[in-house]
Curated annotation (Swiss-Prot):
PROSITE patterns: POLYPRENYL_SYNTHASE_2. Mg(2+) 2 binds at residues 129, 135. It holds the Pfam family polyprenyl_synt. One of its GO terms (molecular function) is geranylgeranyl diphosphate synthase activity. Pathway: Isoprenoid biosynthesis; farnesyl diphosphate biosynthesis; farnesyl diphosphate from geranyl diphosphate and isopentenyl diphosphate: step 1/1; Isoprenoid biosynthesis; geranyl diphosphate biosynthesis; geranyl diphosphate from dimethylallyl diphosphate and isopentenyl diphosphate: step 1/1; Isoprenoid biosynthesis; geranylgeranyl diphosphate biosynthesis; geranylgeranyl diphosphate from farnesyl diphosphate and isopentenyl diphosphate: step 1/1. Gene3D superfamilies: Farnesyl Diphosphate Synthase. It comes from the Viruses. Isopentenyl diphosphate binds at residues 85, 88, 122, 141. This is Trans-prenyltransferase. Dimethylallyl diphosphate binds at residues 140, 216-217, 254.
Length: 318
């Protein structure tokens, strides 16, 4: 009888042990999505800029439908997010795609949540930048700015909601990786690193807005480049070089914008100080340095030619 009890206890312990080992070795820190953001989208297929832009629009629409923004802030946040070029999320998604052609974590990584995060952060900064206490702009993307359409209070709260939701999206991205990519190395540590880095970058962007310098532009490209690299490789190696590439690209982007705004800017403007030709030469030089780094890390793909051309087109006013 005693032997039967021992055997029964052992059997129960074995069942418990097997059940435990079959449980997912992760815990969620965010609520799961009620809709698939990327239904019908495959992250490893090569894409041009137009295709990527349409895919991100689908992701964005699904996220809004899933309730990323609630109550009275749904309309102003959705309004602010429509009609962008989506260059930052496209850069992030393409870096992840290019990295995965060299690395595999058991399943393709869909960086939809991270792509949303970088766009949310960027758009939040635009809302603040347009406010009466900053640039006092009433038009952006050929429509009323958020504060001009919905009022200052809702604009402020919308910028806050976008920023908070951006951090939620980063956490959701880490949860998704833990669930779908079992060979991804220590996603919790990388999630903490990303949140810390993003916080630092947003602080830099905020400081740049206060004095109207390029530091309000470059940090968002750093977020896109570095999040793409870390999510695509699963490592923090070479972050310094990727950050340098992001700085070069962001610098070129800002200089191109300064050329475009040469005749209308009332604040600090590089092209006004150094002249349009010198500024254009610096744009080309910065893009060339960015290209060299991306080539060195084997993540320069054909879509970068389109992305670089868009920067050149801004400078040319075309």
């Amino acid at each position: 009888m005693l032997h039967l009890i021992y055997i029964s206890i052992i059997v129960v312990l074995i069942i418990i042990l097997i059940s435990y080992t079959r449980k997912p070795k992760y815990f969620r820190i965010t609520a799961p999505r009620s809709v698939a953001l990327f239904h019908g989208i495959h992250p490893l297929n090569p894409k041009n800029y137009k295709t990527f832009s349409k895919e991100f629009e689908t992701i964005l629409n699904n996220a809004i439908e899933d309730g990323d923004f609630k109550g009275q802030l749904t309309e102003p946040c959705s309004y602010a997010l429509r009609g962008g070029k989506y260059i930052r999320p496209i850069i992030l998604m393409e870096i992840v795609r290019a990295c995965q052609l060299q690395h595999s974590f058991g399943a393709p990584i869909y960086p939809a949540e991270a792509a949303l995060a970088v766009e949310y952060f960027h758009v939040a900064s635009l809302i603040i930048d347009d406010m009466p206490s900053f640039d006092n702009d009433v038009k952006r993307r050929n429509k009323d700015t958020v504060w001009a359409r919905f009022g200052v209070a809702k604009a402020q709260m919308s910028a806050l909601a976008l920023t908070m939701q951006g951090f939620q999206n980063i956490c959701r991205q880490i949860d998704w990786i833990k669930e779908h990519c079992p060979r991804f190395p220590d996603p919790n540590q990388l999630g903490a690193l990303l949140c810390t880095f993003v916080s630092h970058s947003l602080n830099s962007a905020g400081s740049g807005q206060l004095v109207d310098t390029p530091e309000k532009t470059i940090p968002f490209f750093k977020i896109a480049f570095i999040m793409g690299w870390v999510l695509g490789t699963g490592t923090i190696e070479d972050i310094g070089m990727i950050e340098r590439a992001a700085h070069c690209f962001g610098h070129a982007f800002q200089l191109a914008d300064d050329i475009k705004d040469h005749d209308t800017d009332t604040g600090w403007n590089y092209a006004k100080i150094h002249g349009k030709q010198k500024t254009f030469d610096d744009v080309a030089q910065s893009l060339q340095e960015c290209k060299k780094i991306l080539h060195g890390k084997k993540i320069f793909t054909s879509i970068w030619n389109e992305i670089f051309q868009k920067v050149i087109n801004v400078a040319l006013g075309t």
